[in-house]
Regions:
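Beta1/beta-strand and adjacent pyrophosphate-binding region of the FAD-binding site
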Residues: 2-15, 31
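Gly/Ala-rich phosphate-binding loop of Rossmann-like dinucleotide-binding domains
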Residues: 20, 24, 159
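Glycine-rich FAD pyrophosphate-binding loop
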Residues: 24-45
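Conserved dinucleotide-binding and phosphotransfer motif residues
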Residues: 26, 111, 163
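Short beta-to-alpha linker loops that shape the active-site pocket of alpha/beta-hydrolase fold enzymes
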Residues: 36-38, 121-123, 156
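Dinucleotide-binding Rossmann-like beta1-alpha1 core, especially the glycine-rich loop
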Residues: 49-126
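A short, glycine/Asx- and small/polar-enriched loop/turn
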Residues: 100, 127-135, 177-184
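Helical element adjacent to the flavin cofactor pocket in flavoenzyme catalytic cores
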Residues: 140-187
Length: 187
């Protein structure tokens, strides 16, 4: 059965499902294809939750992307009418001269993120389950939280269908062929 779509997304994991949602709500005729039932337990999206945070210690350049991702998760929650991002706060512990805490501080200062730097005594007082060694500190970010990945996948795919898109699970892409301004996908 031949069908015509504006966009075909091969692989409906976390990224593919989100891409299908964004495209379908902009009015594109979208087909998402995955070789497994969507969602499934074979991808990086499998499992209950993932941590989400703004103070990205790896590099401050990621912070604008993370701010945008928080806004998009909020949009998804609003449209799907379900909770996907649960703010819990996040505590990061490490040597005061290590990579994690100084990296979080750098990102937070560069992007004016709300945070708390906790000395050893403050960590022990506020979080008694942690007794830090000399030279270790804590970094607390109230905006950090838990992202419910499988509910997010379900929300994305349900909304794709609400916007007129299709998600085909248990369908394997055998090959594809580009010709001019179109692409044929054979399953």
């Amino acid at each position: 059965m031949a069908k015509t779509f504006d966009v075909i997304v091969v692989g409906v994991g976390t990224m593919g499902a989100a891409a299908c949602w964004h495209l379908s709500r902009q009015g594109f005729r979208v087909l998402g294809i995955d070789r497994y039932t969507v969602p499934h337990g074979f991808g990086a999206h499998h499992g209950h939750s993932r941590m989400i945070r703004l103070s990205y210690f790896e590099h401050p350049d990621y912070v604008p992307l993370l701010k945008r991702s928080y806004a998009l998760w909020n949009e998804l929650e609003e449209e799907a009418k379900r909770k996907i991002l649960i703010p819990t706060g996040g505590l990061f512990l490490g040597p005061d001269d290590g990579g994690i805490v100084p990296g979080c501080l750098r990102a937070s200062k560069e992007h004016a993120l709300s945070h708390e730097l906790l000395d050893r005594a403050s960590v022990s007082s506020r979080f008694p389950q942690f007794q830090l060694e000399d030279g270790y500190v804590g970094f607390y970010e109230s905006a950090a939280g838990i992202l419910l990945v499988e509910p997010a996948m379900v929300a994305h795919t349900e909304l794709v269908r609400c916007h007129g898109g299709r998600i085909n699970g248990d369908e394997t892409v055998l090959d594809w062929h580009a010709s001019g301004d179109s692409v044929s996908v054979r399953t």
